[in-house]
């Protein structure tokens, strides 16, 4: 899980999800998981 100011899709399987006002990127590759903060 990476915490970044700007979250972007890295690959085709990345999905942008909004949970409780937090923008997240969910992917099969754990390295691609991101959270905005």
Swiss-Prot record:
Keywords on record: Ribonucleoprotein, Ribosomal protein
One GO molecular-function entry: structural constituent of ribosome
UniProt cross-references to PROSITE patterns, sorted A to Z: RIBOSOMAL_L36
Entry's Gene Ontology BP terms: translation
UniProt cross-references to InterPro entries, sorted A to Z: Ribosomal_bL36, Ribosomal_bL36_sp
GO cellular component: cytoplasm; ribonucleoprotein complex; ribosome
Family classification: Belongs to the bacterial ribosomal protein bL36 family.
HAMAP family named among the record's database cross-references: Ribosomal_bL36
Record PANTHER family: 50S RIBOSOMAL PROTEIN L36, CHLOROPLASTIC (PTHR42888), LARGE RIBOSOMAL SUBUNIT PROTEIN BL36C (PTHR42888:SF1)
Protein name: Large ribosomal subunit protein bL36
Organism this protein belongs to: Citrifermentans bemidjiense (strain ATCC BAA-1014 / DSM 16622 / JCM 12645 / Bem) (Geobacter bemidjiensis)
């Amino acid at each position: 899980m990476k915490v970044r100011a700007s979250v972007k899709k890295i690959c085709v399987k990345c999905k942008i999800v909004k949970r409780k006002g937090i923008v997240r990127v969910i992917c099969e590759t754990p390295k691609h998981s991101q959270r905005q903060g």
